[in-house]
Curated annotation (Swiss-Prot):
SMART domains: Costars. The keyword Transmembrane helix does not apply. The lineage of its organism: Eukaryota, Metazoa, Chordata, Craniata, Vertebrata. Keywords: Actin-binding, Activator, Cytoplasm, Cytoskeleton, Phosphoprotein, Protein transport, Transcription, Transcription regulation, Translocation, Transport. One of its GO terms (molecular function) is actin binding. This is Actin-binding Rho-activating protein. Pfam families: Costars. Residues 1-20, 38-99, 173-204 are annotated as: Disordered. Expressed specifically in heart and skeletal muscle. It is found in: Cytoplasm, Myofibril, Sarcomere; Cytoplasm, Cytoskeleton. GO terms for cellular component: actin cytoskeleton; myofibril; plasma membrane; sarcomere.
Length: 375
């Protein structure tokens, strides 16, 4: 038989086999979905009605008793034929091929919504537990300072308590002697007897504590002390003073800055340093220019130390102990590390670390110049 005829005969057989496989796959999928629907409806019927905030313990998962008017859940698939009843009963016991996976919640509620739910539930649990506010009294100041509230509020409360304490301490140190303003008392002589009474007749003094005079006598004096303490230890006044100090310094610096519109030539000429004065030719201490100059000096010092190390490793030692190398050899080796070899050599000679002839070195012309390491 020719190969073309075999392919023609095998074509209908393959298509029929493909149709049978597709139909079988569809039937199995439908049965799997039907089995999943039955199991899910049974689980939903067995679950409790719901959860209430007042109930702290979960209800037992007991199946509900079927009432006389309760009907079984309806299935979504049509009734099977008589011939397929046996197959359906056998396949119902098989494990479903549908994959199950728990889906986590990705939508998160806002911060104030979460806080409201947690506060409501915590308040409900505290009330159910029987803990009342009357049984456990708490100081308001301690509750504010020790609670996990806003740090700004806690800082303000702490500053207020410290200011009041300092004010009372100042009042205790001054200890003014209060005298009654009543005319009848002065005429009767009771006030003088109390003031002239000797100290040995007085009652034993109680432990040291903050003296608080009567409000009717010391109202004006206490207000004055509180105002003084508030002005002395006020955070706003301190911040205002620092800001004013910075503003004054900025105005003064702008008057001395030649690039500023507020530059004062006469003031700059009268305050400038002359040659020989301390700090002449150097930036102002504490300025950004001084910091950059310090970093530049440290960088140049590291470059000089690296140059001396390279000369020491590649040079030949003489009998007298000196280390020498020619400029051509050093340039060929050092140009791979840095292209500023000439500038670093000039700086090292200024510090007395190396020595060579001439004021300047040129590649090609001064390759024979000998460089001696002095350290």
């Amino acid at each position: 038989m020719a190969p073309g005829e075999r392919e023609r005969e095998a074509g209908p057989a393959k298509s029929a086999l493909r149709k049978v496989r597709t139909a079988t796959l569809v039937i199995n999928l439908a049965r799997g979905w039907q089995q999943w629907a039955n199991e899910n409806s049974t689980k939903q019927a067995q679950e409790p009605a719901g959860w209430l905030p007042g109930a702290t313990h979960d209800l037992p998962n007991a199946p509900k008793e079927a009432g006389p008017y309760q009907h079984a859940p309806k299935t979504l698939s049509p009734k099977p034929d008589r011939d397929g009843e046996g197959q359906h009963s056998e396949e119902a016991t098989e494990v479903s091929h549908i994959k199950r996976k728990e889906v986590t919640r990705t939508v998160v509620s806002k911060a104030y919504e979460r806080g409201g739910d947690v506060n409501y539930l915590s308040h409900r649990y505290e009330n159910d537990g029987g803990v009342s506010e009357a049984i456990q009294p708490e100081n308001d100041i301690d509750r504010i300072l020790l609670s996990h509230d806003s740090p700004t509020r806690r800082r303000k409360c702490t500053n207020l308590v410290s200011e009041l304490t300092k004010g009372w301490k100042v009042m205790e140190q001054e200890e003014p002697t209060w005298k009654s303003d009543s005319v009848d008392t002065e005429d009767s002589g009771y006030g003088g007897d109390m003031e002239e009474r000797p100290e040995q007749d007085a009652a034993p003094v109680a432990p040291a504590r903050i003296k608080r005079p009567l409000l009717s006598q010391a109202n004006r004096y206490s207000e004055t002390l509180n105002c003084k303490a508030h002005r002395k230890y006020s955070q706003v006044d301190n911040l205002k003073g620092r800001w004013q100090q910075w503003a004054d310094e900025h105005v003064q610096s702008q008057k001395l800055n030649p690039f500023s519109d507020e530059f004062d030539y006469d003031l700059a000429m009268s305050t400038r340093l002359h040659k020989g004065d301390e700090g002449y030719g150097r930036p102002k201490e504490g300025s950004k220019t001084a910091e950059r100059a310090k970093r530049a000096e440290e960088h140049i010092y590291r470059e000089i130390m690296e140059l001396c190390f390279v000369i020491r490793t590649m040079a030949r030692h003489r009998r007298d102990g000196k280390i020498q190398v020619t400029f051509g050899e050093l340039f060929d080796r050092y140009v791979r590390i840095s292209d500023k070899v000439v500038g670093i050599l000039m700086r090292a000679r200024k510090h007395g670390l190396v020595h060579f002839e001439g004021e300047m070195l040129w590649q090609g012309r001064d390759d024979h110049v000998v460089i001696t390491l002095l350290e």
